[in-house]
Amino acid sequence: MIILGIDPGLARVGYGLIDCNMTQKKMLDCGIIKTSQDHNDGERMVEITRDLRYLINKWKPQIASVEKFFFYRSSTTIKVVQARGVVIMTLARFRVPILEFPPMQIKLAVTGSGKANKDEVSMAVIRELDLSKPPRPDDASDALAIALTAYYQQRIVK
C-alpha cells in the first residue's frame, strides 16, 4: 500500500510517500511543493493543486494522511487552512481516501510522546524508515511522520 503524507502550508507543502505492508515500510519519495511568493494566494493554490495532482498521478497512493488543525487565530493560519482545503479537495477529486490526524497524535504515533519536538520526530522517521540521514526540509520529514501515523493506524484497524 502506498501512503501519501501531507504537511499543509501556503508557502510550502511537505509531502512524503511510503510503501508498506503489514510488516515492512520504506520511503518512496519526499520533498516540498514550494509556491512562488510573487504570486497571489489564488495562484499559489493553483500551484499546490497542480503539483499534488502530479504526485497522485505518479505514485497512485491508496491512502492520504493530512495534518489536522485546531487553531484559527492569525491571518497566516487562515491561509494555511485554505491551502489545507485545496489539498483535501484535490485528494477527494482523485478519490484518494483521506485520514486526518492532529499534531499531538502524529508525535505520539511516531515517538511515543505527544509532546515530542521536531528533532525527536525527525529521529523517529529516520529510525522507522531506516534512512541514513534526516529528510529535508523539516516539512518533508513531518509529512513522512504523518504518513507513518496512517500506516500505524491502518495496521491497528486490520
From Swiss-Prot:
**Entry GO terms, CC:** cytoplasm; Holliday junction resolvase complex
Q: What is its main location?
A: cytoplasm
Name the PANTHER family for this protein. Answer: CROSSOVER JUNCTION ENDODEOXYRIBONUCLEASE RUVC
Q: What is its EC number?
A: 3.1.21.10
- What residues does Mg(2+) 1 bind to? 7, 139
Quaternary state and interactors: Homodimer which binds Holliday junction (HJ) DNA. The HJ becomes 2-fold symmetrical on binding to RuvC with unstacked arms; it has a different conformation from HJ DNA in complex with RuvA. In the full resolvosome a probable DNA-RuvA(4)-RuvB(12)-RuvC(2) complex forms which resolves the HJ.
Similarity field: Belongs to the RuvC family.
What are this entry's molecular-function GO terms? Answer: crossover junction DNA endonuclease activity; DNA binding; magnesium ion binding
The subcellular location is: Cytoplasm
The gene from which this protein is expressed is ruvC
What UniProt keywords apply to this chain's record, in alphabetical order? Cytoplasm, DNA damage, DNA recombination, DNA repair, DNA-binding, Endonuclease, Hydrolase, Magnesium, Metal-binding, Nuclease
Q: Give the source's domain of life in one word.
A: Bacteria
Enumerate the Pfam families for this protein.
RuvC
List, separated by semicolons, the cofactors it needs.
Mg(2+)
Q: Which reaction does it catalyse?
A: Endonucleolytic cleavage at a junction such as a reciprocal single-stranded crossover between two homologous DNA duplexes (Holliday junction)
Positions with a binding annotation for Mg(2+) 2: 67
Keyword Nuclease assigned to the entry: answer is yes
**Known function:** The RuvA-RuvB-RuvC complex processes Holliday junction (HJ) DNA during genetic recombination and DNA repair. Endonuclease that resolves HJ intermediates. Cleaves cruciform DNA by making single-stranded nicks across the HJ at symmetrical positions within the homologous arms, yielding a 5'-phosphate and a 3'-hydroxyl group; requires a central core of homology in the junction. The consensus cleavage sequence is 5'-(A/T)TT(C/G)-3'. Cleavage occurs on the 3'-side of the TT dinucleotide at the point of strand exchange.
User: Has the keyword DNA repair been applied to this entry?
Assistant: yes
The record's annotation in SUPFAM superfamilies points to: Ribonuclease H-like
Write the protein's name: Crossover junction endodeoxyribonuclease RuvC
Catalytic residues?
7, 67, 139
